[in-house]
Amino acid sequence: MQVDFYHLTRQPLTRVLPRLAERVVADGHRLLIVSDSADQRAALDRLLWDYAAESFLPHAEAGAMDDAAQPVLIAAAPDPLNGARYVLIADGVWRDEALGFERAFHLFDESAIAAARTAWKALADRAGVERRYWKQGEKGWEQAG
């Protein structure tokens, strides 16, 4: 299982999340986006409808329509009702339930850096967990750990 820590320093979540979601779906995977905040989930739902004029990313909020049919599902908890094997943590709060997925994307900004460091360290000795740390550089994302 792979955990990718994305430290948002140059671009906000609203710019990074849609591109990651597009890439996951283009690669033939399903994605579960997790946030504890109902306001953030609603904002992400709106964002994925209109973040780029040329893009269309089918998705829904959990419970809004047929969850199992959604390539991208936005939910409060890491329960893959859409059969997702990839999870994206959008609220910056690490959840160990993400370890039940094939791959986890943990996005966080400066306000959540201490918690992200704690999660990074806690996962260091977990068997079967490969950690990657990504930071935003001048030329885009750079793997730093």
Give, region by region, the residue ranges found by the protein language model.
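Residue-level detector of anion-binding/catalytic polar loops
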Residues: R30, V129-E130
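Conserved functional acidic sites
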Residues: R126
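Positively charged, polar, low-complexity stretches
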Residues: Q2-L99, L107-A112, R117, Q136-G145
